[in-house]
Every structure is written in structure tokens, then in C-alpha cells.
């Protein structure tokens, strides 16, 4: 009798961000929406949505590359600098700063919930069964997702949870 093998279930997570602008190095995330879809049945089995409260810029969200800085630049990097929220981007998404202040969740909490969502969406064991990210212009959304998890200090957990590989600079790139 042949050994029984468990059929693998592959999952895609539809990712969509609303943002304060187009540059993930300068602009903030304002809203995230996720949708988990089984690739065998095309069934949507989980959803997540959250507004993200305003937060400050951090070096942790930038790609790791060697950058020479003067002492003055290093000292200046210690102060709070708010992320950009361009009015055109807010108008396009119909999100206001008041909405973000009153309904927005802490960025670190949102990042943790995104990783928890992906763990729930992993329906089979094995590295090849980790969820893949899907969406329209997904490279744009991935940049903001990386900013979110890096700022929250969850980059290692992000790498364990999603399917992906490392680029030339050693940065994890999900696929």
C-alpha cells in the first residue's frame, strides 16, 4: 500500500495599502487591507482592515546600505520627525488626519496583527506553503509593508511567515 501524502494548500494574501504618498521611505501608511485566498478553491477565508495612527520616521524602515554621515547628521537623526502625509494622497483615499488620530491603531500593533493574520492563513506545513502576496502594483504595497514591519521591529518574524528570498543587500523580499 502506498503511503498517504497530505495535499498541500497554497494561499495568497491580497494586500492593499492606502498611504500618505508614493515614497515608502518618506510617506506613512494610512490604511491596510488584507484578504486570504485559497488557491485550490479560490475561497476567501479571512479578511483584515485597519487604519494606522500617525507615526514618526525611523531609520529602521530604510534598506540596509552603508551610508556615511557626519556627527551632526547622526545627532539630528535622534529627534522625532513625522512621516509625510501629502494632501493629494489623503484626498485620493478620502482618509483624513482626524480619522487617523481617532480611528488609527498603533503601527506596531497593526504590524503584529498582519503577521498573526499570515500565520492563520498558512494552511499547510513547509517553506513552500508560506503565503504569497498578491495585488495590483504589488511592489508599491510591499515597500510599505516592509516599512511597517521594520519600524515595528518584526522583520525577522515577517521573514519566517511569508514566502520570499533575500536581495543583493541582504533585505528580505517577499513574493
Task: List each language-model region with its residue ranges.
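Glycine- and charge-rich intrinsically disordered segments
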Residues: 1-4
Amino acid at each position: 500500500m502506498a503511503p498517504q501524502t497530505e495535499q498541500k494548500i497554497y494561499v495568497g494574501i491580497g494586500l492593499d495599502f492606502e498611504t500618505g504618498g508614493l515614497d515608502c521611505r518618506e510617506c506613512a501608511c494610512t490604511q491596510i487591507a488584507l484578504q486570504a485566498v485559497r488557491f485550490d478553491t479560490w475561497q476567501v477565508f479571512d479578511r483584515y482592515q485597519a487604519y494606522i495612527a500617525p507615526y514618526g520616521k525611523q531609520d529602521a524602515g530604510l534598506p540596509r546600505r552603508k551610508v556615511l554621515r557626519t556627527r551632526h547628521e547622526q545627532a539630528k537623526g535622534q529627534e522625532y520627525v513625522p512621516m509625510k502625509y501629502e494632501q493629494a494622497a489623503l484626498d485620493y483615499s478620502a482618509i483624513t488626519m482626524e480619522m487617523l488620530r481617532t480611528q488609527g491603531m498603533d503601527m506596531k500593533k497593526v504590524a503584529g496583527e498582519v503577521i498573526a493574520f499570515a500565520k492563520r492563513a498558512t494552511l499547510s506545513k513547509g517553506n513552500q506553503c508560506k503565503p504569497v502576496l498578491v495585488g495590483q502594483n504589488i511592489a508599491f504595497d510591499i515597500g510599505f509593508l516592509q516599512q511597517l514591519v521594520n519600524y515595528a521591529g518584526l522583520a525577522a518574524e515577517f521573514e519566517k511567515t511569508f514566502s520570499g528570498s533575500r536581495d543583493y543587500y541582504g533585505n528580505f523580499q517577499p513574493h
